[in-house]
Amino acid sequence: MPLKFTEVMEAEITKAIVETASEEWVEYAESDVIVVGAGPSGLTAARYLAEKGLKTLVLERRLSFGGGIGGGGMLFHKVVVEREAKDILDDFGIRYTEHRNFLVADSAEFMAKLAAKAIDAGAKIIHGVSVEDVIFRDDPLGVRGVCIQWSAVEISGLHVDPLFLRSRAVVDATGHDAEVISVAARKIPLEVSVVGERSAYSEVAEREIVEKTGKIVKGLYAAGMAVAAVHNLPRMGPIFGGMLLSGKKVAEIVAEDLKL
């Protein structure tokens, strides 16, 4: 007996997608927190922010999760995490093995569970969206949201005006280029210069990225490798304890600043 599917009308597929997606865009036109970048620090921050009851939107320019996790170390499918971040791995249900002084996790499981736990906590993640600018106010000076564009439009070079999303806080978790802070520093008198990261010194990088995670200006925060770009810190390679701890720390700082 042939398998029978529900009748499918092609136009109804379009309606279902456009109507439900549009409803969510309207809902998230205003959020408590916008996290830019779905890498390790961004996903960690999103999970803990959402758990605190903050309306949290994650925007990722690519069509995947995990930032630099997926490539492991030079395409070997493993990443290293320091024992100091063990509690976060356990909190996300990420399995690991012990290897000398480190914990070693599977890169695919690592990024999948970071994303799943962030979503389960209530964060909304939308792929294929780039942040090309910020919304600001000057009394007092601060960031109040972002200007967004489809990544495909950005890549194509077409001239298409962006749309705007307001938020009480924006977290730059875009990685090595600190893209949100970079554009804000160029266009707003933030007295911040993004000089970029230094060459590798893993121990110092991991420690100082966590120490310097936090607020750049009212409404704008740095997490993960964006911190290295802003503060000219060393890079660290495929070791992710600092990224996890930075994501958790920025969530705590944002929640405190928003009085939650």
Curated annotation (Swiss-Prot):
Q: Which PANTHER family match?
A: THIAMINE THIAZOLE SYNTHASE
Residues that, per the record, bind Fe cation: 161, 176
Q: Does the keyword RNA-binding apply?
A: no
Identify the domain of life: Archaea
Quaternary structure and partners: Homooctamer; tetramer of dimers.
| Keywords attached to this entry | Iron, Metal-binding, NAD, Thiamine biosynthesis, Transferase
What biological function has been recorded for the protein in this entry?
Involved in the biosynthesis of the thiazole moiety of thiamine. Catalyzes the conversion of NAD and glycine to adenosine diphosphate 5-(2-hydroxyethyl)-4-methylthiazole-2-carboxylate (ADT), an adenylated thiazole intermediate, using free sulfide as a source of sulfur.
Q: Where does glycine bind?
A: 235
Q: Where does NAD(+) bind?
A: 41, 60-61, 68, 131, 159-161, 225
Extract one GO molecular function annotation from the record.
Answer: pentosyltransferase activity
State the similarity comment. Answer: Belongs to the THI4 family.
Q: Name the needed cofactors.
A: Fe(2+)
Which InterPro entries does the entry link to? Answer: FAD/NAD-bd_sf (IPR036188), Thi4_fam (IPR002922), Thi4_prok (IPR022828)
Q: Which reaction does it catalyse?
A: hydrogen sulfide + glycine + NAD(+) = ADP-5-ethyl-4-methylthiazole-2-carboxylate + nicotinamide + 3 H2O + H(+)
The top EC class, named as a word, is transferase
What pathway, per the record? Cofactor biosynthesis; thiamine diphosphate biosynthesis
Protein name as it appears in the record: Thiamine thiazole synthase
| GO biological process terms held by the UniProt record | thiamine biosynthetic process; thiamine diphosphate biosynthetic process; thiazole biosynthetic process
EC annotation from Swiss-Prot or TrEMBL: 2.4.2.59
Query: Does the record bear RNA-binding in its keywords?
Result: no
Pfam hit, one: Thi4
